[in-house]
């Protein structure tokens, strides 16, 4: 069985963001994924895996094989177990289309691709001052070492940057958005569902320097996860406030619902006042409790009886310019299920869909005029030992050869007003725009 060549390096000092992002420079396919203390970077494609409702396609070099899907989670696990490579890590995305598949809805405008993954040719795994270099081919280890030496000489100082001004883009599609909010409120009042998150796509006037945007945005945020990935034609940078699902090698499942928000300013006294307000706002508390209850119900469907516990409840989490109420749940995955069953059960995050999920997902597909694609889906890693880590794709910036955009949304309930919800999305666009660096 094939193995990665590996080499550990201990640095004299921790790498800064500019150095770390520099390891990705000039690559066709890559994914940088920050998970707590570890930053993992997969570069180049050794194996490509595309998943739709109908089939799983595996590409290794020029060899292509396909597996018909009978039961998605079981079939995907079976395909991955057949990979002839030791201790691999897979990087990839789950599109919002997974939610429609999971709840038995036609893909509609979301398209057929559910997952896209790649197992990289080379990798860096960075943890503090320790760096692990990995390569399928021994001769590429020299390239990895050389690149690492180059970026270590590059201190954290930037050339003059041109920030993208939000300008008129914050008002993009104003009347459309107010109309769909009103439609959502009407459907909630008629009893179709309790809550739905409705979003609008906002095109940007300039192409972006995604490397500088990632560095600048990461400095301004305290995310649960961050990522910068380029896969095929799509490039995405994001600062995720929460994970949809985490599964460790011992089959422990975790999820981390956030609901309830206040601003986070530069004034500690103001922040303390807002935090206290958040902890005593009955509407925010009720909204959070409903989200935790739904997460618990979903966990119980895939975890062993009596193993699901709330390990943290209603803690205040700081995320850049906002603070949220956050809770954490843990359970033990049932013996006959795998990590993909856990992800599919918890996907999409209630934060980005609504309550009940199926009815909210159906409404999103019907009311919003454009497909979400990766927005409100997941960027993730998956290891050969079954470990999975899936970040929620919010607070993200997207770019292809044709366009650059952000997408913002708001949670709609029966008391929502179109004007207030539109203002909330304006605030989110303005907040994101402060982190964007235009391409020169």
Predicted regions and their residues:
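An anion-binding catalytic pocket shared by soluble metabolic enzymes
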Residues: 35, 40-50, 196-286, 301-307, ...
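Flexible loop/turn segments at secondary-structure boundaries
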Residues: 11-14, 38-41, 97-101, 204-206, ...
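A residue-level signal for conserved active-site and pocket-lining positions in enzyme catalytic cores
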Residues: 92, 124, 191, 245, ...
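Cytosolic ligand/metal-binding cores
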Residues: 1, 5-8, 126-152, 246-320, ...
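Conserved hydrophobic core element of enzyme catalytic domains
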Residues: 325-440
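A short glycine-rich, hydrophobically flanked beta-strand micro-motif that places a catalytic Asp/Glu
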Residues: 92-94, 196, 226-230, 372-380
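An N-terminal JmjN-like helical accessory module and its immediate linker preceding a catalytic domain
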Residues: 1-63
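Non-catalytic accessory segments adjacent to catalytic cores
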Residues: 70-204, 430-439
């Amino acid at each position: 069985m094939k193995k990665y060549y590996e080499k550990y390096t201990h640095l004299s000092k921790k790498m800064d963001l500019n150095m770390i992002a520099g390891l990705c420079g000039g690559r066709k396919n890559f994914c940088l994924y920050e998970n707590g203390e570890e930053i993992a970077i997969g570069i180049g494609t050794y194996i490509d895996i595309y998943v739709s409702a109908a089939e799983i396609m595996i590409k290794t070099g020029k060899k292509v094989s396909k597996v018909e899907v009978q039961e998605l989670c079981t079939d995907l696990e079976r395909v991955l177990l057949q990979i002839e490579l030791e201790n691999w890590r897979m990087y990839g995305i789950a599109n919002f289309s997974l939610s429609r598949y999971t709840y038995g809805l036609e893909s509609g405008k979301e398209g057929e691709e559910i997952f896209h993954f790649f197992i990289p040719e080379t990798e860096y795994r960075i943890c503090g001052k320790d760096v692990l270099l990995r390569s399928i081919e021994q001769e590429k280890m020299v390239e990895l070492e050389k690149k690492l030496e180059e970026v270590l000489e590059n201190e954290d100082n930037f050339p003059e940057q041109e920030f993208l001004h939000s300008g008129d883009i914050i008002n993009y599609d104003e009347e459309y958005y107010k109309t769909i909010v009103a439609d959502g409120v009407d459907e909630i009042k008629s009893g179709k569902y309790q809550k739905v998150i409705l979003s609008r796509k906002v095109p940007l006037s300039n192409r972006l320097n995604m490397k500088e945007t990632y560095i600048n945005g990461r400095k301004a945020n305290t995310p649960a996860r961050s990522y910068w990935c380029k896969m095929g034609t799509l490039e995405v940078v994001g600062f995720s406030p929460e994970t949809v699902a985490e599964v460790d090698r011992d089959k422990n499942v975790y999820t981390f619902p956030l609901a309830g928000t206040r601003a986070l300013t530069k004034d500690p006294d103001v922040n303390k006042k807002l935090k206290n307000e958040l902890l005593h706002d009955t509407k925010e508390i009720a909204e959070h409790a409903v989200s935790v209850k739904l997460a618990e119900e979903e966990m119980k469907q895939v975890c062993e009886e009596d193993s699901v516990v709330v390990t943290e409840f209603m803690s205040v989490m700081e995320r850049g310019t906002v603070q949220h109420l956050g809770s954490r749940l843990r359970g033990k995955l049932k013996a006959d299920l795998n990590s993909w069953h856990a992800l599919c059960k918890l996907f999409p995050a209630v934060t980005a869909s609504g309550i009940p999920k199926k009815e909210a997902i159906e409404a999103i597909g019907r009311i919003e005029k454009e497909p979400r694609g990766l927005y409100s889906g997941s960027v993730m890693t998956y290891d050969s030992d079954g470990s999975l880590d899936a970040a929620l794709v919010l607070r993200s910036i997207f770019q292809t050869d044709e366009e650059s955009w952000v997408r913002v949304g708001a949670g709609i309930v029966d008391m929502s007003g179109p004007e207030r919800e539109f203002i909330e999305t304006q605030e989110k666009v303005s907040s994101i725009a402060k982190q964007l660096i235009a391409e020169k």
